[in-house]
C-alpha cells in the first residue's frame, strides 16, 4: 500500500495559501495570483452576505457546506462565526444528516451545496429531513446551466428530483433582492425548504416591484390576454423581456413569476390559463419533471379545455460543456426563438373542440 499525501497548489505559493480560491480559477496574474477579471456580485456572494446579516440577529443559525466554503459564498460567515460554520469536506450525505440532527435540537441549519452534488445526498434529504419534517434550509447553488464549470456540474435535475418528495417547499428567486427575501423567509419557516439559484450574477433586467414572500404564492409581473408566460428563477427576466418584445408586435402577454414550484400557486395559474388559453413555461433545468411538467399536469388535472401549451427548458439528455449563451441557443432558450414560437402560435387557427394541444 502506497499512501501519497498531496498538497493542493503545490509549487505555486498563491495557490498553496489559497487552495479554495484556485479550485476553479479564471485567468490571473502569475506574480500576485490575483484574478484579471473584475469581481462582480453573484448569487453566491449575495447569499453569503445575507446569511451573515440574518445570523447576527439569530444565534440559532448555523451554516454547513461540503468543501466549498468560498464557492458557495460562505467565506465571511466562517470568519464571523467560526463556531457556527461547518465544512464537512466532500461528504454531502454527512452534511445533510448532520443538518437534520442540528434541526432536531433546535438549531437552524443552512446547507449550501452545488445542485449537482445534492444528488449524492438524496436519501438523506428524503429520510433524515423530509420524513421528519425538519427545519433544514437547503440552498442549491449552481442550479441550472453552469457554463464553463462543465458537464458534470450542470444543475439540471434539482427541481425534478426534489419536487416528488413530500413535505418539502421549493423556491427560486428571479434576482438578488428576491434571493434575500427568500432566505429570510426560509430561516423563519418551519420545515424542509429549498432555494435554488444559478451560477453568476443576476440578469440585466430590472424589476420595479418585489412583493413579500408568501408560501405557495406566485407573482404576476404583467397582466395580459393573449398568452401566459410562466417562468421561475433566472428565467423570469427572460420572460419579462419576451413580453416587452411581444407587446411591440401587438401580442399581449401575461408574465407570472412562479416563485414556488412546490407548493404551486394553482389558483393564480389556472385563472391565467383560462383567460389566455395559451401558455408557455420557461425554466433553467430539465423539462422532465420540472416546472413545465407540473403545469402540464395541472392543465390535465383541472380538465382545462382548448389550451395551447409549450415547455421551454432542457431536454432529456446530459448537457455538454459550453458558455451559457451558447447552450441556451442550442436548445432554443433564447428570447428570439421563444418570441418566434409565440408569433407562429398566435397566427395558427387552432381546432378548439375540447382539445388540449401540447406542442
Residue ranges of predicted features:
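Thiamine diphosphate
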Residues: 1-25, 33-79, 87, 93-97, ...
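Short beta->alpha connector loops at strand-helix junctions that form conserved
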Residues: 88-89, 113-114, 172-175, 282-284
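Short, well-ordered alpha-helical packing segments
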Residues: 100, 126, 130, 159, ...
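Conserved G/P- and acidic residue-centered "switch" motifs that form tight phosphate/ATP-binding loops
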Residues: 106
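Active-site glycine- and acidic-residue-rich loops that bind
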Residues: 116-118, 175-180, 288-289
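Internal gly/pro-rich beta-alpha loop/helix module
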Residues: 148-165, 172, 176-187
Amino acid at each position: 500500500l502506497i499512501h501519497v499525501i498531496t498538497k493542493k497548489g503545490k509549487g505555486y505559493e498563491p495557490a498553496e495559501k489559497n487552495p479554495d480560491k484556485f479550485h476553479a480559477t479564471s485567468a490571473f496574474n502569475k506574480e500576485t495570483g490575483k484574478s484579471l477579471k473584475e469581481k462582480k456580485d453573484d448569487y453566491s456572494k449575495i447569499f453569503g452576505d445575507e446569511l451573515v446579516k440574518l445570523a447576527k440577529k439569530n444565534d440559532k443559525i448555523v451554516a454547513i457546506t461540503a468543501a466549498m466554503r468560498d464557492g458557495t459564498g460562505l467565506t465571511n460567515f466562517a470568519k464571523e462565526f467560526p463556531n457556527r460554520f461547518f465544512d464537512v469536506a466532500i461528504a454531502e450525505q454527512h452534511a445533510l444528516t448532520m443538518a437534520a440532527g442540528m434541526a432536531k435540537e433546535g438549531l437552524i441549519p443552512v446547507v449550501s451545496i452545488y445542485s449537482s452534488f445534492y444528488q449524492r445526498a438524496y436519501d438523506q434529504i428524503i429520510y433524515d429531513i423530509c420524513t421528519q419534517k425538519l427545519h433544514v434550509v437547503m440552498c442549491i447553488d449552481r442550479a441550472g446551466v453552469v457554463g464553463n464549470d462543465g458537464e458534470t456540474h450542470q444543475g439540471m435535475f434539482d427541481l425534478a428530483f426534489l419536487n416528488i418528495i413530500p413535505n418539502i417547499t421549493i423556491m427560486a428567486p428571479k434576482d438578488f433582492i428576491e434571493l434575500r427575501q427568500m432566505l429570510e423567509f426560509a430561516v423563519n419557516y418551519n420545515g424542509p425548504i429549498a432555494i435554488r439559484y444559478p451560477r453568476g450574477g443576476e440578469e440585466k433586467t430590472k424589476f420595479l416591484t418585489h412583493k413579500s414572500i408568501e408560501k405557495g404564492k406566485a407573482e404576476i409581473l404583467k397582466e395580459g390576454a393573449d398568452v401566459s408566460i410562466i417562468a421561475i428563477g433566472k428565467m423570469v427576466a427572460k420572460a419579462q423581456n419576451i413580453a416587452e418584445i411581444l407587446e411591440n408586435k401587438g401580442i399581449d402577454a401575461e408574465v407570472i413569476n412562479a416563485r414556488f414550484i412546490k407548493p404551486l400557486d394553482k389558483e393564480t395559474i389556472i385563472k391565467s390559463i383560462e383567460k389566455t388559453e395559451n401558455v408557455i413555461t420557461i425554466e433553467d433545468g430539465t423539462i422532465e419533471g420540472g416546472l413545465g411538467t407540473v403545469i402540464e399536469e395541472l392543465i390535465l388535472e383541472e380538465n382545462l379545455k382548448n389550451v395551447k401549451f409549450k415547455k421551454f427548458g432542457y431536454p432529456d439528455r446530459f448537457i455538454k460543456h459550453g458558455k451559457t449563451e451558447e447552450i441556451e441557443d442550442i436548445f432554443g432558450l433564447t428570447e428570439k426563438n421563444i418570441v418566434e414560437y409565440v408569433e407562429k402560435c398566435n397566427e395558427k387557427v387552432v381546432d378548439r373542440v375540447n382539445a388540449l394541444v401540447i406542442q
